[in-house]
Amino acid sequence: LTIKVVTDSTADLPPDLIQKLDITVVPACVIFGNKTYRDGIDISQDEVYHKMITENIPASTSQPPPADFADAYQKLLKDADEIVSIQATSKLSGLCNSALQGKNMVDGSNRIAVVDSLSVSMGLGLLTLMAARLAKAGESLPTIIEQLKESIPRTRLWGFFDTLKYVLQGGRLGKAKALLGSVLPIKAILTMRDGELHPTGAVRTRTKGIERLIDNFKKAVNVQDAAVVYSTTPDDAQTLKERINAISDKIPVYISRLGPALGVHGGPGTLVLALREKVANLNQEIKDGEKLKKRISLPSLHRPKLNSFCL
């Protein structure tokens, strides 16, 4: 069976990995004034941050229409047997709901599983990479979904924000907004927990912010892989990657750039650290579709329940 993997542009995946692992990315929408752009297609990261810094144009985002997901699914099902579509947290975005609606517009919708990652940026990205490697290795849809279910609660994400201005304007803070409504010149650290953003600290300098991200990495257990995401400061991202490699040099650490859809909420200077902890008792590792010798059989799942799967 051939399984294709779909995600949305808020995953912030590096382009080379998208191509290498044959991942389909449905773009979210970025809105500046009265103009709507497709994330990464009609507008680039540089253009977004230029508008934010120099033009001071109010920005917002929206999920793609269900038809965009339906079109992607229909094209893939011409050659694929099944699809797993992994989306940004449903608690902060309508992307998962849009994907579910798009699925229901497609003939053969029972061959599509939609999964709520309960994360964003490379938290979603790391889960998507895992699913794509499993699919490339020939794993079944139930196995991929089972491993996603195991990995989602073990995927961690922290964001360092140079300013709270864009975070507060974006309206995605939920419970964190009341705690971050201060006008003090602080730089906030937020974490993703149960699909929502929560404040976890504040610092007054970028250096201290990077140290906080490093401290969070040190507290993680059995890290499988990690990612550093930046908006406008690639040197800081490289420094953070090198610091992580110095602590744990055996895990892959990806660097990517915060895409337009999340960039308008994070703003210039944002740094994100995402990591995925190993699943307990899982004696298996997949690398770019090559199966290693040590394997375990995962419990089978009742297939009909997977067809509308959304965590």
Residue locations for each model-derived region?
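Mixed-charge interfacial surface used for oligomerization/domain docking
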Residues: 4, 10-24, 29, 92-113, ...
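N-terminal glycine-rich anion-binding loop in soluble enzyme alpha/beta folds
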Residues: 4-63
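Glycine-rich, highly charged phosphate/nucleotide-binding loops
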Residues: 62-72
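Glycine-rich phosphate/diphosphate-binding loops that line cofactor/substrate pockets in enzymes
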Residues: 71-81, 216-222
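Ordered, amphipathic secondary-structure segments that act as subunit-interaction surfaces
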Residues: 75-88, 94-97
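Short, flexible active-site-proximal loops enriched in glycine and acidic residues
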Residues: 80-83, 111-115
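Positively charged N-terminal leader segments that act as targeting/secretion signals
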Residues: 288-306
